[in-house]
Amino acid sequence: MSMPNAAMRYAPEFQVRLQGELVPAALRASISSVNYQTGLEGADRVELSIFNENLRWLDHSLLRLDNDLKISMGYAPDPLRQMFVGEIVALAPTFPASGTPMISVSAQDRRYRMQRGSKTRWFALHTKCLGNFPLPDVAVAGLVSGENGLMPIMDPIGAALSIVIGGVEAAVSFSDPDARQKMIRRQSGESDYDFLRRVSAENGWEMVMDHQGPMGGRRLHFLSMADHLTPEVTLRYGQSLVDFTPRISNVGQVAQVAVNFWVPALNMEFLVAAGWDWDRSALTLDIVPGYGSSLLTAQKDNNKNPVMILNEPLTSETAPRVLVTKLLAKLNNRLTGSGRCVGDPRIQAGTVMRIEGVGQQFGGLYRVTSATHSIDSGGYQTSFEMRKEVWFGSVPLLEQGAVKVDIAGQTLRIGRP
């Protein structure tokens, strides 16, 4: 490859479409920076900074609230990746005493509409003979998504596990009408977004927007972590990874999460505790009579292996699902990190990344929890937040790229053996 072509290959490029059409060349030339943020929480968002010389763009018809906006990023001359599809939600012009006036254009994906208002309702299938039966969470997620004009996408393993667990819960409560009523999903004064976040959390899903393809911005992906363990991006410190700051802490960590619940049929209280076996990389579940709860906590060193007791109104059917959700939230925040690299459009919320050249403890597989892509006069950069999930423990360290840093004499050699 010749030098001119090599330089062109690494020329950052972006494309903006408003109302389905490429913006005029004059408007494109006035855009000073593009900032795109994506995360596992909240709607994805974009901010454009536009030079508003002579106030030429102040009342332009393309810059209106609710107008469709699409952003693509990448490097010329390669095809750009469609990164964002959403709507303009805010306009903020500035009129400085000196200097060039600016306009900031903010857009969010269509999930922001789901955050408006609140609803109170329940999701059940009514039968004449047996009364109300709870709808599976997969169906609930699909119904609420469809009401908001979104197409739900379910990962196979995540959907199957949800259906199996829901089926077990339904079978256990089949002969108990009161138990069936308690299992019915209720949206109690929540927005559709908050309700789906709660349903997703209790099933081990993450909600991310798929911006790719002709249906981009309308495909709501209920991401199952167990379906995505293969790294899509590999970064190496000293090469593609510009900087990296990991953090490991046992502050707030627990060995088990437990809850007490009453079983009327047995006239007895039980304690259910979910834990994590680090040696086997597997979940554990203990069920003991209520009087055994003190024995369970006594078996743990409360300084090294604390047990968190939940104070929530749970039943024998719903307790295991909620316990595992609470436990995983704690475990997956034990080792987190942040980093920065040369702009890479592949880095999105939910992406699995392999970090190399930072030792065994801090190297290996991570899940991206948020990413920011910025293109301005300084070029194209991507910064990200990430977490090391317990599921990655099933992948051998060598395959993860997590190896020790070797020091030979005065030479520091970072890499695989």
Q: Which residues fall in each region the model found?
A:
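Flexible glycine-/small-residue-rich
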Residues: 18, 50-52, 73, 107-111, ...
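Well-ordered beta-strand positions in beta-sheet-rich domains
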Residues: 33, 81-85, 104, 120, ...
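Charged- and aromatic-enriched interaction segments used to assemble
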Residues: 102-238
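An acidic/polar, Gly/Ser/Thr-rich interaction patch typically located in mid-to-C-terminal regions
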Residues: 35-62, 240-417
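A structural signal for the main folded, soluble domain(s) of proteins
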Residues: 52, 70-71, 93, 144, ...
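Extracytoplasmic assembly/pore-lining segments of large envelope/extracellular complexes
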Residues: 24, 38, 82, 97-102, ...
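Short, solvent-exposed secondary-structure boundary/capping segments
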Residues: 92-109, 216, 374-387
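Assembly/oligomerization scaffold segments
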Residues: 1-114
